[in-house]
Amino acid sequence: KGELVVIMIHGWGGGTEAPKPQLELQKALGDVYVVAPLYPRAQIMEKYNIEKDGRAIWNDSWSLNLTVPGTPHDDWRGGGDANGTTMSSYDVVDELLARLSDRALYPNLKKIVLAGYSAGGQFVGRYVAVGKGVVRDGIALEYAAMAPSTYLLPNSTDTWHYGIGNRPRYSRDMSEEQIMGNLRRRRCLHGCGSLDVGEKSLDKTPCAMKQGENRFARYQNFKALVEKDSRWAEKVVFHTFDSIAHEASKAYADPYLLKYMKEVK
């Protein structure tokens, strides 16, 4: 029937091939399109011996040292531009949404879920705040941001993507009121595994460490922040993946998440 589309955003080590949970999610949900845009980094292409062939590449300013931040302006996780371009990682999602909103191509489409895990969860959480999020009437657009290394704290003057200072081109001209307006009207599931307390690929920059010692602690602290704002909390669903560490495939197979993706409010 083509009533559901999931746009799946890969993690920090992805960007050169479809994410591993893509086919598993497609099988679990049944009649669904799963679309997975890629945001490669030069480091990942070198790791897999992939030559630079003209494709867009992000994050040249970010080193392998997880205690040292790069610039937000080339970081795909927060809408930064591909190196040497004015194409934001969020522009790609906007183009996908425009394409999916074409009634002639997808006449039965009722719901789109932008979902991401780990670095993909960072991407989604920030798109909720600043993304255009435009779809045609009759399509519900919802979000699932899972197990991110860090969260956007809209009440913080820290640099993007931890706070709202020094935002990249895509969201530079937005006001704080617009950002909070998006957060208070867009439905998003935030999830994290109860055992996600390891340090693999964990952001350890000073701004990140202020959010907590590990992903699960940061998730709990973010939940407490959201619950202080009743209008924001009304649109947020928090879900703890029981007995799961940092394991994307297990999270995407979680029955609660699958139900969230399928249901149309």
Predicted regions mapped to residue ranges:
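C-terminal catalytic histidine-bearing segment of alpha/beta-hydrolase fold enzymes
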Residues: 191, 203, 223-265
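The feature captures the conserved acid-bearing segment of alpha/beta-hydrolase catalytic domains
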Residues: 136-228, 246
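Extracellular/periplasmic catalytic domains that process cell-envelope and extracellular macromolecules
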Residues: 1, 26-30, 106-108, 119, ...
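Short beta-to-alpha linker loops that shape the active-site pocket of alpha/beta-hydrolase fold enzymes
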Residues: 38-42, 149, 244
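Phosphate/oxyanion-binding active-site loops and adjacent basic polyanion-contact surfaces
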Residues: 82-94, 214-219, 248-253
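Residue in the alpha/beta-hydrolase core beta-strand immediately N-terminal to the catalytic nucleophile
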Residues: 111-113, 142
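Gly/Ala-rich beta-loop-alpha elbow adjacent to hydrolase catalytic centers
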Residues: 116-124
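Serine-hydrolase catalytic machinery in alpha/beta-hydrolase-like enzymes
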Residues: 3-111, 122
